[in-house]
């Protein structure tokens, strides 16, 4: 999917990977970039607007843990303004295994709820035009960082739900793929808590491994958007982009 002249909603588009990805998206010339984030950052929005004055960048405060009905109201406002939306990026995430309920609420439930809300506007069974969803998951959805089992499990759940969305595309008209970054230098990984303090130095130890910059990740994210492959499981690690094959150990046959 060419980004040029498209209308894009980016949930958590002002975070570490999110903000660099927003920059790269704006450079590609969408018609509208709507950023939904919990904390307003006027300086960041101003930077995005200055980067490409031909792109309309707007911001709405949004907490992904609100009920689906509240999300639907916000999306109604956006659809009333833009008329059409081509791409939804779900990027909200926290890494802190002290906060068990919130980790699950943000990393998994919030992604599912935002997706459920936008289906009211996209689902072809309701006369919608369809759309594309890109969910930011994590390589920990493939293999856990065992010191942060809550975070890893939440990302595995988000990945699994994204794979299911892709399979449902013939029914809903909505395609989906996952973005799974490896260890990336962002504020998220500089300091975080392991579950029950099983490894107090987990953040420090993790950063001893090879990493990538958030810019490298963002540039490959844009390549994945442009590839627009329904069901793709993209691994963005060490500055590379790779579509991985999901190993099937069981099939429902339905």
Swiss-Prot record:
Reactions catalysed, semicolon-separated, are: a primary alcohol + NAD(+) = an aldehyde + NADH + H(+); a secondary alcohol + NAD(+) = a ketone + NADH + H(+)
Which keywords fit this entry according to its UniProt record? NAD, Oxidoreductase
Per UniProt, substrate binds at 138
Q: Name one GO biological process term.
A: alcohol metabolic process
What Gene Ontology cellular component terms go with this record? Answer: cytoplasm
Q: Which Pfam families match?
A: adh_short
The catalytic residues are 151 (proton acceptor)
EC numbers listed for it are: 1.1.1.1
Q: Which residues form a coiled coil?
A: none
Q: Name one GO molecular function term.
A: alcohol dehydrogenase (NAD+) activity
Give the residues the record marks as binding NAD(+).
10-33
Family to which this protein belongs: Belongs to the short-chain dehydrogenases/reductases (SDR) family.
Quaternary structure note: Homodimer.
- Name of the molecule in the record: Alcohol dehydrogenase 1
């Amino acid at each position: 999917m060419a980004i040029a002249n498209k209308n894009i909603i980016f949930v958590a588009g002002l975070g570490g990977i999110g903000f660099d990805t927003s920059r790269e998206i704006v450079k590609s010339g969408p018609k509208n970039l709507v950023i939904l984030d919990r904390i307003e950052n006027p300086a960041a929005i101003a930077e995005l607007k200055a980067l490409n004055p031909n792109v309309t960048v707007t911001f709405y405060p949004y907490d992904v843990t609100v009920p689906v009905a509240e999300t639907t109201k916000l999306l109604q406002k956006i659809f009333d303004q833009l008329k059409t939306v081509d791409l939804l990026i779900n990027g909200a995430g926290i890494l802190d295994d002290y906060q068990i309920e919130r980790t699950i609420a943000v990393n998994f439930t919030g992604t599912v709820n935002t997706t459920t809300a936008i289906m009211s506007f996209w689902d072809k069974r309701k006369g919608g035009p369809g759309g594309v969803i890109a969910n930011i998951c994590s390589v920990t959805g493939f293999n856990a960082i065992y010191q942060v089992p809550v975070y890893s499990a939440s990302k595995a759940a988000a990945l699994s739900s994204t794979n299911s969305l892709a399979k449902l595309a013939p029914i809903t008209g909505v395609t989906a793929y996952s973005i799974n970054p490896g260890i990336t230098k962002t504020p998220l990984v500089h300091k975080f808590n392991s579950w029950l303090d099983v490894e107090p130095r987990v953040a420090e130890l993790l950063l001893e491994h090879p990493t990538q910059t958030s810019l490298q990740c963002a540039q490959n994210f844009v390549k994945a958007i442009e590839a627009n492959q329904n069901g793709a499981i993209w691994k963005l690690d060490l500055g590379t982009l790779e579509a991985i094959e999901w190993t099937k150990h069981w099939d429902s046959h339905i």
